[in-house]
């Protein structure tokens, strides 16, 4: 899985967790939010929890007191099996709350490592969970690469949220232009061009080391910046890896090289970087619209066709709306013992006819139930597909959700769904043969 895909999936999981946590309402101050930085000692955290457990004795309501102390005990038990705080720290949520039906009591114990290192300790017992650190994670998720170059050297860095990192830098000694004539001037000009050429080649090589990981670019976009024409020459240079060139989002002039140039490039590129995600989304969905307009059979859209194509292994890139609401079920027939899968809308999931076998007059048992997006995240690689998320915050994204069901696939080979549908109706296809 490439870095971009991995970050998109992590982002989706964090958004879902935020939604779940923010719906929870505890009994009194029974919901624990705990943030632990990477170098903190677990023994010190345990002592804080022990002190909080003692203070909870002063809570007048016995029900609230028990809920708070139970949450503290569960938190301590969870920490007891953690040998060491992960490199980026730890975020823990624990407590019991009343479900949306206002009757069922639910318990949550969620532990996750932040995407980046945290440096503060935070402990809160309240009637709601403190989710701001998770929201900060989402805002800081996208990483961008920077190459700053001038006649004195180059700097390679990344920007992620407000955190900048210098990956590599080196100096260069390029000869200045020679003002004299004659043979020496020609030799000097050749030497100057050769050194400039070698400089460009070295920058391109270092860029690969900094921004290519597992044969893929490890940043969402790349900014080329510098004084004079160096940055433009690099963009056009044959040595610059095509994968890196494809990720260049802007080329900007800065007045300085080195770290000062890096800071200025960050400041001047903010608007372009904010638009990168939506540009990628727009291009992806526009490509779908163009293929559909040409009646292409190398794309599919809508739940039924896309799931068929995925199970066939025909989907190269699966595109889904981040808030897709379908539910995936695995069902078992208690009479025949056969298992089957079905994907339903939330409304369909409340209708009993989808869980009945009329032939055997029995009700199908639900073996597994997942949000479809969750199931796709866990299984898309098994079908050889890539996974892309889109929002409905752009005009194209909104049209994709409303007109195409929020799910589509770009296919690795042509699939004739009309012919498949006809064969299924005529009984030519064996459903156990994965549509092949």
UniProtKB/Swiss-Prot annotation:
Q: Which InterPro entries match?
A: eFR1_2_sf (IPR042226), eRF1_1_Pelota (IPR005140), eRF1_1_sf (IPR024049), eRF1_2 (IPR005141), eRF1_3 (IPR005142), Peptide_chain-rel_eRF1/aRF1 (IPR004403), Ribosomal_eL30-like_sf (IPR029064)
Protein biosynthesis: is it a keyword of this entry?
A: yes
Q: Which UniProt keywords apply?
A: Cytoplasm, Protein biosynthesis
Q: Answer whether the UniProt record assigns the keyword Protein biosynthesis to this protein.
A: yes
Q: Name one GO cellular component term.
A: cytoplasm
Q: What is its main location?
A: cytoplasm
What Pfam families does the database record attribute to this sequence?
eRF1_1, eRF1_2, eRF1_3
Question: What one GO molecular function would you report for this record?
Answer: translation release factor activity
Q: Where in the cell is it found?
A: Cytoplasm
**Function comment:** Directs the termination of nascent peptide synthesis (translation) in response to the termination codon UGA. In L.striatus UAA and UAG codes for glutamine.
Assembly behavior: Heterodimer of two subunits, one of which binds GTP.
Record-stated family:
Belongs to the eukaryotic release factor 1 family.
Supply the name of the protein. Eukaryotic peptide chain release factor subunit 1
What would be the name of the gene that encodes this protein? eRF1
């Amino acid at each position: 899985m490439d870095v971009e895909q991995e970050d998109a999936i992590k982002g989706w999981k964090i958004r879902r967790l935020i939604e779940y946590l923010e719906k929870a309402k505890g009994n009194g101050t029974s919901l624990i939010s705990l943030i632990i930085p990477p170098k903190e000692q677990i023994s010190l955290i345990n002592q804080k929890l022990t002190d909080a457990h003692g203070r909870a004795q002063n809570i007048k309501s016995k029900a609230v007191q028990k809920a708070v102390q139970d949450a503290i005990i569960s938190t301590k038990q969870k920490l007891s099996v953690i040998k060491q705080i992960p490199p980026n720290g730890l975020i823990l949520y624990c407590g019991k709350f009343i479900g949306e039906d206002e009757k069922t009591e639910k318990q949550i114990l969620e532990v996750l490592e932040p995407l980046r290192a945290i440096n503060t300790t935070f402990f809160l017992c309240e009637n709601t969970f403190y989710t701001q650190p998770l929201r900060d994670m989402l805002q800081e998720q996208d990483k961008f690469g920077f190459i700053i170059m001038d006649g004195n050297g180059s700097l390679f860095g990344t920007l992620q949220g407000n955190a900048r990192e210098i990956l590599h830098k080196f100096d260069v000694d390029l000869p200045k232009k020679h003002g004299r004539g004659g043979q020496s001037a020609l030799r000097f000009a050749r030497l100057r061009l050769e050194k400039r050429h070698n400089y460009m080649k070295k920058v391109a090589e270092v860029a690969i080391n900094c921004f290519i990981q597992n044969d893929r670019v490890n940043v969402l976009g790349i900014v080329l910046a510098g004084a004079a024409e160096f940055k433009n020459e690099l963009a056009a240079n044959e040595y610059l890896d095509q994968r890196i060139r494809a990720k260049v989002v802007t080329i900007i002039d800065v007045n300085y090289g080195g770290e000062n140039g890096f800071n200025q490039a960050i400041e001047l590129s903010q608007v372009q970087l904010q638009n990168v995600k939506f540009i990628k989304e727009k291009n992806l969905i526009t490509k779908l619209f163009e293929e559909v307009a040409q009646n292409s059979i190398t794309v599919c859209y809508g739940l039924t066709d896309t799931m068929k194509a995925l199970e066939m292994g025909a989907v190269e890139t699966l595109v889904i709306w981040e808030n897709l609401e379908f539910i995936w079920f695995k069902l078992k027939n208690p009479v025949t013992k056969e298992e089957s899968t079905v994907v339903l809308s939330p409304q369909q999931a409340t209708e009993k006819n989808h869980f009945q076998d009329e032939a055997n007059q029995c009700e199908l048992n639900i073996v597994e139930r997942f949000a479809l997006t969750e199931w796709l995240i866990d299984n898309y690689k098994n079908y050889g597909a890539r996974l892309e998320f889109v929002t409905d915050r752009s005009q194209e994204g909104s049209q994709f959700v409303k007109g195409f069901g929020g799910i589509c696939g770009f296919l690795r080979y042509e699939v004739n769904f009309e012919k498949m549908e006809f064969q299924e109706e005529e009984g030519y296809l064996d459903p156990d043969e994965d549509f092949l």
